[in-house]
């Protein structure tokens, strides 16, 4: 009779563990690919691209820096460092609020808008080749619906509806 203890199974074994690990691995792999492609072709990180895109979506191509940080899921110090780099490149400018000196805005410049336009084709091609092209339309709709159930920051957030 063996006195050795049974070796526990290591790694994801339940459906929830398998799904969680698959999501983490897919996310990490996609971020590396998208970052690499944008850096190689346009000298932008994926976070740079997301900030330029978010600013371009605003009617005046401008947002309060604190709101921009929240919209791209960065900390206030993280958005400050990122914006400093984009400011040095001439893609973003800092603007003050005339009614509240504590408030500063990030403003997308024409040069930043052009850089975003150029990088968009690379990003869209990456999404199609590394992600969307691997699923049917129905699968993409299901995946989008499932992922939108997840909160973005905390229990009060509404996932994709926030």
Per-region residue spans from a language model:
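Short, hydrophobic-biased segments on the C-terminal half of alpha helices
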Residues: 65, 83-84
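N-terminal leader segment of winged-helix/HTH proteins
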Residues: 1-42, 89-91
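C-terminal regulatory/oligomerization modules of transcriptional regulators
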Residues: 1-14, 137-162
């Amino acid at each position: 009779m063996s006195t050795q203890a049974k070796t526990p199974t290591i790694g994801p074994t339940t459906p929830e563990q398998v799904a969680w690990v698959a999501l983490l691995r897919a996310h990490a792999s996609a971020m590396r690919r998208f970052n690499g492609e944008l850096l190689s072709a346009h000298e932008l990180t994926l976070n740079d691209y997301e900030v330029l895109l978010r600013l371009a979506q605003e009617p005046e191509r401008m947002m309060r820096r604190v709101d921009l940080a929240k919209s791209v899921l960065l900390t206030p110090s993280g958005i400050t460092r990122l914006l400093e780099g984009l400011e040095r490149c001439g893609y973003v400018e800092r603007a003050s609020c005339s009614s509240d000196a504590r408030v500063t805005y990030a403003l997308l410049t024409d040069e930043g808008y052009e850089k975003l336009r150029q990088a968009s084709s690379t990003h869209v091609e990456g999404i199609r080749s590394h992600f969307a092209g691997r699923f049917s339309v129905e699968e993409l709709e299901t995946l989008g619906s499932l992922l939108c159930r997840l909160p973005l920051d905390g229990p009060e957030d509404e996932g994709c509806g926030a």
